Structures are given as structure tokens and as C-alpha cells.
């Protein structure tokens, strides 16, 4: 392959064009079939025929029907603990949840975890609870703020709970907070 071909994105028309260039050295029939990738090609002598199967791409294959996603569990925390000011333990739990939902190891600028960290930093400097940023401020619409989402599992719940506990001065979780919501979602999903 040339350097230009390596940097050029693959187009369906190019695949058929490349299939026409296939030649056989023995003059026999060669067939290449890879239905998983959507390409079927056959060559006989100097002639080649190719077919490209168009597949529909599912927007989010990890999210299945009838299960509760991590993003939805974060939104449920708004209903149970929405008036709670965001603390470091909450920010850590939200970050762990975002990492598990998206599969990324770092947090996204402007994402749910970044907002939670900013809120926790700001809240640590403010004396009055009345003016502090709450979980409702950070987590409302969380599932739409995540670039990808997946069904909550027991491993996800354990990771989020561990993050919240490690960052709490008393090594506990808030009873109706972020970790509790993800754990409840995982229990519901496991029973299905």
C-alpha cells in the first residue's frame, strides 16, 4: 500500500474498485469472503466481482433494552440526594461512574465528572450550605452529557462505591447518594 492509501479513509466504492484489481497467478478461482466486515469478493482470471454489504450501525450497542444505565443511575441520585452539596467523595464517585460508563480513563472537559470536581472545589471554599453547588446542579441530565453509556453492573457499583469511600473522611458512603444509586441500578439489572 502506498502512503496515500494508508492515510485515506476507506470508502465503499473504493472496496469494489480494489476488488476489480485482484488478479490470480494460477488462473483459477479465488474467493475472499468476510461477511463480518461486510465484503465479499471473487476473482476468476483477470475479472473480479465484489459486493459490499451495508450494515446499520447501532448508536450504542452496550445499552440494552430494559436495563438501567450508569447515566440513569446518576440521574436517580438527583431524586434521592439532589439537595446534598457536592463533596470530594461525590466527585470521586461521579468520576468513577463516568469512567465506567464511557470506557475512557480520563475525564472529559465539560463533562459530568469535571463539573463535579469543580463544584467540590468551590464548595470546599464556601462556608454556607445555602450557596453551595448541589448534586442536582451537577447530575441533572447526566445521561445526555455522557458521550456513551452502558448498563450498570455489580463491578461498576463496586468501583463507584470504592471511589466514594476512599475519598470520604469517615470512609463511608452517603446512604442515598451516587454509589447507592449505581448499586441499586446494578441490583435491578442483575435480577433481570
From Swiss-Prot:
GO CC annotations on file: cytosol; nucleus
Key words of the record: Cytoplasm, Nucleus, Repeat
Entry annotated with the keyword Electron transport: no
Domain SMP: 68-125, 133-190
SS bond partners: none
Disordered, as annotated region: 146-174
Alphabetical list of InterPro entries matching this protein: LEA_SMP, LEA_SMP_dom
Feature: compositional bias, Basic and acidic residues: 147-158
The keyword Repeat belongs to this UniProt entry's keyword annotation: yes
Subcellular location: Cytoplasm; Nucleus
Motif Nuclear localization signal (NLS) per record, residues: 5-9
Protein family according to the UniProt entry: Belongs to the LEA type SMP family.
Role this protein plays: LEA proteins are late embryonic proteins abundant in higher plant seed embryos. The function of those proteins is not known.
Protein name: Late embryogenesis abundant protein 47
Amino acid at each position: 500500500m502506498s502512503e496515500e492509501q494508508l492515510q485515506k479513509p476507506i470508502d465503499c466504492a473504493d472496496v469494489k474498485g480494489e476488488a476489480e484489481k485482484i488478479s490470480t497467478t494460477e488462473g483459477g478461482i479465488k474467493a475472499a469472503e468476510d461477511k463480518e466486515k461486510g465484503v465479499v469478493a471473487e476473482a476468476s482470471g483477470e475479472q473480479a466481482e465484489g459486493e459490499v454489504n451495508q450494515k446499520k450501525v447501532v448508536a450504542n450497542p452496550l445499552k440494552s433494552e430494559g436495563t438501567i444505565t450508569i447515566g440513569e443511575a446518576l440521574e436517580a441520585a438527583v431524586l434521592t440526594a439532589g439537595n446534598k452539596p457536592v463533596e470530594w467523595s461525590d466527585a470521586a464517585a461521579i468520576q468513577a461512574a463516568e469512567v465506567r460508563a464511557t470506557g475512557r480513563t480520563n475525564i472529559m472537559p465539560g463533562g459530568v465528572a469535571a463539573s463535579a470536581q469543580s463544584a467540590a472545589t468551590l464548595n470546599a471554599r464556601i462556608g454556607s450550605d445555602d450557596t453551595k453547588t448541589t448534586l442536582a446542579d451537577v447530575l441533572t441530565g447526566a445521561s445526555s452529557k455522557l458521550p456513551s453509556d452502558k448498563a450498570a453492573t455489580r463491578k461498576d457499583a463496586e468501583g463507584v462505591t470504592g471511589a466514594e469511600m476512599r475519598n470520604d473522611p469517615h470512609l463511608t458512603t452517603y446512604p442515598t447518594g451516587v454509589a447507592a444509586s449505581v448499586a441499586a441500578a446494578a441490583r435491578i439489572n442483575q435480577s433481570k
